[in-house]
Amino acid sequence: MKKKLEDYMDWPKIEDLEYAECRNVEDVLGAVAVEDGILFRCFFPDADKVLIKIKGKSRTVIMKKMDNCGYFAALTAGKKIPEYTYQVQYKTGKMEIIDSYTADHYVDAMDEVMFANGEHDRIYDKLGAHPGQVAGYAGTWFAVWAPNAVSVSVVGDFNNWDGRLHPMRRLESGIYELFVPEVGDGDIYKYEVHGYDGKTVMKADPYGFYAEKRPASASIVWSIDEYEWQDADWLKKRKQTNWKKEPMVIYEMHLGSFKKPMGGGFYTYRELAEKTADYCKKMGYTHVELMPVMEHPLDASWGYQVIGYYAPTSRYGTPEDFMYFVDHLHQAGIGVILDWVPAHFPKDEHGLGRFDGTCLYEHLDKRQGEHPHWGTLIYNYGRPQVANYLIANALFWLEQYHADGLRLDAVASMLYLDYGKQDGEWIANMYGGNENLEAIEFLKKLNQKIKDRRDGSLSIAEESTAWPMVTGNIEEGGLGFDFKWNMGWMNDYLEYIKTDPLFRKGRHGMITFSMVYQYSENFMLVFSHDEVVHMKGSMYQKMPGTPAQKLAGLRQSFGYMAAHPGKKLLFMGQDFGQISEWSEERGLDWNLLADGKAMASGTG
């Protein structure tokens, strides 16, 4: 018996759609071949009339409005779904639009398998927002991983932030995707996630390439493949250089407080490129190390509480502006190392925490999933898609932004399950120990991926314990880093040097002990930002004596550092004798150079 149009209506699912709670929208949207022909279905809540324009036919098909909410349907003769568009009429006008729910999938089956296995090194090419075309119509593909969500919609100014208008198609892997016509570079968006826990939250895109400037938090559609790089000579030289055998003097810097404009605010990436390159060349630095430039909501975190791992912060400009920064330094012969934070992430509602209504990126048990003294969440490195997210991100910065290396922050907190925790606040591994076995394998895999590039990229560990073989070969059980910060040397020396010379007798072993273990790792000597904040005082303030003696102590310290084996890293401002403690809220005291009070002036 021939069915009527109404017989094909799945009213419970249509109701879910109208409340933006439909898990599989392809069950009620798009065109599908049925027993009696081709069934067309669409949802335009404010439309008065919808017509189907079929390619090659002059007449349009009027769709029937099936309910008062804006669900339209039509049944036509035929066995093959034709090419078609919708002509949607509103009180304020009309528009012609393609049906996104009949388009081919952007994320294919191989992408899903590779991602599920944690082996998709370029997953950022598929997840996130990617401008493109479907059937000749320009728009943007959106894709996000939220396997436990009831439904996910993409929302933005383009649909008045109405989650009913662009519900996304769910794939078997738990990835949601959708092509949205007429959306392109510069459009802001978020994902409206109806979570497993019954809550609806607005999430920024974990794979978004650009984001609004804080305190706004939406992602921005942005193409990042159009910049024309001019650093081919640098990349060729880097590939041929063994940095373990070459001098390295690294200038650690925070872009927002290196220098400040007279009127407040920040210099742009392009402005900072000129200023940074000029200064580093003059001072003889081989590299800069940037405190995290990935998007973060809180200035006071200095970038170490990241929300947008794939987006350079919009505080200083666009992705192309940051590419220019790296490019300009490369052309000046200066390498660029990025601080990278895979150890933890913040709890901001628009971030990764409870992304789909479950602990998707973090552990469910707080004893595994939270840092109690940082108030942040810990990644579940054993989940393949989470490890893939992070490893692909590391490779992304090396590939897309030509970074010369990554300095991994807080590696010790990754390696130890009981890091910063009291008894009862952590869970032992399967062998009863405190080692995070999943994090260990994650780090080995990451470092192997970087080594496999064979392009001279470096990985550096800030690891504050005596964990063995941090820079050891992976094949021999090591973690595979190229260099490790020598925190022991730094702590011993600072404890020694702040003592008045009259009382240093019997303490000289503190400046020689480092040679006992010097060759157990590939060490990097550091006087980093961590030592000149939080009431610790500047390097100048740590020195005993009169102002002249303090400056002399600084020169002595840097001379000792230069003579000691190991690569060197110095935080900005210390090289000219910055007097005040560093703060992200103000620029360095460059006036000291002009006033003749800096160490570089020779005073003292």
Q: Which residues does each PLM region occupy?
A:
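The feature marks proteins involved in alpha-glucan
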Residues: 1-37, 58-61, 66-146, 170-252, ...
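Short proline/glycine-enriched turn/loop motifs at strand-loop junctions of beta-rich domains
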Residues: 43-49, 145-152
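Short acidic/polar active-site loop segments enriched in Thr and Asp
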Residues: 48, 150, 285-288, 404, ...
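Short beta-strand elements bearing conserved aromatic residues within extracellular beta-rich modules
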Residues: 50-52, 152-154, 189
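Short catalytic/ligand-binding loop motif for oxyanion handling, primarily in non-cytosolic enzymes
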Residues: 200-201, 259-261, 296-299, 344-348, ...
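Substrate-binding/active-site clefts of carbohydrate-active enzymes
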Residues: 209-213, 232-245, 254-435
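Conserved alpha/beta catalytic core and glycan-binding cleft of carbohydrate-active enzymes
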Residues: 215, 402-404, 422-587, 592-593
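Amphipathic alpha-helical
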Residues: 602-604
